[in-house]
């Protein structure tokens, strides 16, 4: 894929973007993680009670109006346009044929799809639907232990009132990200920073989408694009513009130079 590629992810998506940056090193020129689900074992999924909340959450209503009212109540802090989009795309009719009445209505994404983000569906392999040991997904904790392996500039964008990106969590993210100090390419600048959006919670991109977009654009435009255009992209263009003959000549000169160093 042609660079630059910028990774942006929220919550579990932030964890997945960060994981991809480690497993496919240098795939991203930079990444922006919005309130990512990344933390040590004492801050892992087993401690948050998300599975219990998911199983208790209502997912079906008799009418579309009832479903819309429930969503508008649950997500009342969201930006109105974002909330309208959620309602438009997250509710569907359960009717089995055109002869049936419109209702009932359910969420497009059911409990199971959400639950397996938090708890491993071990019954799929064992065939036993009861009596299985409860095993939580370990992705957020795994990524926490891999933060030192990150090699691209990283911005943590956090909600000021979020219960996930607490001051302690942000301190750990900033201190551990890219801490192993892998050798840098010429011109490479590896930054780690944070920005806080006041009066927002974990759903900050849905609550204040414009402010989040402005912060992300500022990070990309003022810093990352300049670095790319002035250094990394320019160096890559020099190599791409060389003929195969000149590339081979450069490689031979480089290997001869290495003989005096190794």
Swiss-Prot record:
GO terms for cellular component: peroxisome. It is found in: Peroxisome. It comes from the Eukaryota. The keyword Membrane does not apply. Keywords: Hydrolase, Peroxisome, Virulence. Disruption phenotype: Abolishes the production of ACT-toxin and impairs the formation of lesions on leaves sprayed with conidia. Does not affect growth rate of cultures, sporulation, and spore germination. The keyword Disulfide bond does not apply. Abhydrolase domain-containing protein; part of the gene clusters that mediate the biosynthesis of the host-selective toxins (HSTs) ACT-toxins responsible for brown spot of tangerine disease by the tangerine pathotype which affects tangerines and mandarins. ACT-toxins consist of three moieties, 9,10-epoxy-8-hydroxy-9-methyl-decatrienoic acid (EDA), valine and a polyketide. ACT-toxin I is toxic to both citrus and pear; toxin II the 5''-deoxy derivative of ACT-toxin I, is highly toxic to pear and slightly toxic to citrus. This is Abhydrolase domain-containing protein ACTT2. It comes from Alternaria alternata. The lineage of its organism: Eukaryota, Fungi, Dikarya, Ascomycota, Pezizomycotina.
């Amino acid at each position: 894929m042609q660079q630059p590629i910028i990774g942006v992810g929220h919550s579990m998506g932030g964890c997945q973007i960060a994981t991809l940056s480690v497993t496919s090193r240098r795939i991203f020129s930079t990444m922006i993680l919005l309130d990512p689900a990344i933390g040590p074992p004492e801050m892992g999924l087993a401690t948050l009670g998300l599975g219990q909340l998911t199983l208790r959450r209502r997912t079906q209503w008799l009418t579309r109006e009832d479903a819309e009212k429930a969503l508008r109540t649950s997500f009342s802090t969201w930006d109105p346009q974002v909330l309208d989009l959620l309602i438009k795309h997250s509710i569907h009719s359960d009717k089995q044929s055109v002869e049936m009445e419109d209702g009932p209505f359910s969420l497009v994404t059911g409990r199971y799809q959400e639950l397996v983000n938090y708890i491993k569906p071990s019954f799929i392999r064992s065939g036993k639907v009861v009596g299985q040991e409860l095993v939580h997904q370990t992705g957020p904790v795994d990524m926490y232990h891999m933060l030192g392996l990150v090699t691209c500039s990283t911005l943590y964008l956090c909600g000021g009132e979020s219960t996930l990106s607490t001051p302690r969590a942000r301190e750990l993210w900033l201190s551990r990200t890219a801490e192993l100090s892998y050798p840098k390419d010429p011109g490479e600048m590896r930054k780690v920073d944070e920005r806080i959006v006041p009066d927002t919670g974990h759903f900050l991109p849905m609550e204040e989408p414009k402010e989040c977009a402005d912060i992300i654009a500022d990070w990309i435009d003022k810093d990352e694009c300049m670095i790319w255009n002035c250094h990394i992209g320019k160096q890559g263009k020099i190599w791409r513009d060389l003929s195969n003959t000149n590339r081979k000549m450069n490689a031979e000169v480089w290997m001869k130079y290495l003989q005096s160093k190794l």
